[in-house]
Amino acid sequence: MLQAAAGAWADPPPTEATPAAPYLLAGAPTFDLTVVKFREKYNRDNPKLPIGEFRAIPTAEDDSPLLTRAASKLNENLYASTALEKGTGKIKTLQITHLPLQQATEEKAARAIAISYMAALMRQFEPALTVEQSQNKVNSLLEKGKGSRFYQQQVGAIRYVVSDNGDKGVTFAVEPIKLALSEP
């Protein structure tokens, strides 16, 4: 089942297939991680769910001049994307976007592959989770975010975001957040 995703291409998705992240907060922190280091570790940890090289996406007029967007095509209906801080190349968000297929029989398998990628991404930030636990957690987040342009859940210093755009696809994102000390 996962072999269909084994060939990861580096071609960026069409611009219309990668909506700008409306949930990426202005002034959001970065992970202390570049996309090259992330891919090295991710691909070493997930050899059956590889992410190919990220390619820059041409900027649109409404894009932030402080960010570089990049994407990697995983298969015909699945993309990994990121927003990087200009100058440092540090990651502000990592995303997996699943574009639904018209054929119901193919969509079930495609969705299972997408969830596997989303769960693998989650385990990069919560390494204590098992494959099953991470898949259950992703399914729960997708269910809670179903039909919502923005659903988030905070876990420590990160947040998971689900952006459901209906027939245009669903995006699962991982982003760092600023932790504030509570006042006594």
Residue spans for each PLM region:
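Short helix/turn-capping signatures at newly exposed starts of structured segments
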Residues: 9-67, 92
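Sec-dependent N-terminal signal peptides
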Residues: 1-2
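Short, low-complexity, Pro/Ser/Thr/Gly-rich segments in the mature regions of secreted, periplasmic
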Residues: 168-184
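Ser/Thr- (and often Asn-) enriched beta-sheet segments in non-cytosolic proteins
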Residues: 93-95, 152, 159-161, 171-173
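Long, charged/polar, surface-exposed segments that mediate recognition or autoinhibition
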Residues: 80-143
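A cross-family detector of function-defining hotspots
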Residues: 46-87, 127-165
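Residues at beta-strand starts and edge strands
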Residues: 89-92, 166-170
